From Swiss-Prot:
Its EC number is 3.6.1.7. Keywords: Disulfide bond, Hydrolase. Belongs to the acylphosphatase family. The active site is at R20, N38. Disulfide bonds join C5-C49. GO terms for molecular function: acylphosphatase activity. Coiled coil: none annotated. HAMAP family: Acylphosphatase_entero. It comes from the Bacteria. It holds the Pfam family Acylphosphatase. This is Acylphosphatase. Residues 5-93 form the Acylphosphatase-like domain. Signal peptide: none annotated.
Length: 93
């Protein structure tokens, strides 16, 4: 498999419920780099880079609702070319 980067915007009850923290934990478990960031519109932006199959697993996990305390109503994804080198998976503020 090849390495890819995907950017996702997750909408629903995804802020104030530990969404970024649990996304970081899941991404690290899958060996991915990138970040999770709360957006002003109430969504969460996630950039995930790594092995294509592992990125797909994270996106599937996000679509299934992520952490139990969250409620995902909609997720949009597209290929992404980061403007920086991502060496780990972080929470951004």
């Amino acid at each position: 498999m090849s390495n890819v980067c995907t950017i996702a915007w997750i909408y629903g009850r995804v802020q104030g419920v530990g969404f970024r923290y649990t996304t970081q934990h899941e991404a690290q478990r899958l060996g991915l780099t990138g970040y999770a960031k709360n957006m002003d519109d109430g969504s969460v932006e996630v950039v995930a880079c790594g092995d294509e199959a592992q990125v797909e697993k994270l996106i599937k996990w996000l679509k299934e609702g992520g952490p139990r305390s969250a409620r995902v109503d909609k997720i949009l994804t597209e290929p992404h070319s980061p403007h920086e080198t991502l060496t780990d998976f972080s929470i951004r503020y």
